[in-house]
């Protein structure tokens, strides 16, 4: 992975393993290429709000993505993306 996905994995790992969070979520606009990184490391699509912001002459959708502790634990157990 690149620097962005490595940094995101570090933050998510800290959230679940050090802060003992049950859920981590983010809101990403449809023009943000980083949405693929979130999905790649295991965030799931939880909903879309259509045309929530007007930017650079166009309306953009807002996507809600989330990861549960149980998702993280399963991905770690399967050694997918989350090498310890």
Residue ranges and their predicted role:
Residues 38-39, 43, 65:
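Conserved active-site tyrosine of GNAT-family acetyltransferases
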Residues 61-68:
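A short hydrophobic beta-strand segment most commonly corresponding to one strand
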Residues 71-84:
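Acidic/histidine-enriched, glycine/proline-rich intrinsically disordered or flexible terminal extensions
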